[in-house]
Amino acid sequence: MSVQGIDGVLQQMQVKALQASGTPIARPSVEPGFASELKAAIDKISDTQQTARTQAEKFTLGVPGVALNDVMVDLQKSSISMQMGIQVRNKLVSAYQEVMNMSV
C-alpha cells in the first residue's frame, strides 16, 4: 500500500541521510507536480478502460479462461473510474470559475 503524501517525506529523509553521509546528491530531473499527477490519473483511467474493453472482447470471442464475472467487474471498475474522473474535472472547472469570478 502506497500513500502519496508519504513519498515526498520519504524522499526528503533519504536526501538528509545522503547529506549526512557526505554522498553527492543526484537531483531528480523532473519534480512531480499537478500536471504530472493529473496525467498519471488520466492514464490510469485510460488503462482501466482498455483492460475492460480487452476482457469484454476476449469473452465475446469465447477465449477460454475469461469468465463473465471477471468481465463485469472490470467493466464496473472502468465505469467507476470514469465517473470519478468526470467529477474531479467538474470540481476543477468549478474551482477555476470561482477564482476567475473573484474581484481583485
Swiss-Prot record:
The keyword Transcription does not apply. Keywords: Bacterial flagellum. Its main location: other. GO terms for cellular component: bacterial-type flagellum basal body. GO terms for biological process: bacterial-type flagellum-dependent cell motility. One of its GO terms (molecular function) is structural molecule activity. It is found in: Bacterial flagellum basal body. It comes from the Bacteria. Belongs to the FliE family. NCBIfam families: fliE. This is Flagellar hook-basal body complex protein FliE. It comes from Pectobacterium carotovorum subsp. carotovorum (strain PC1).
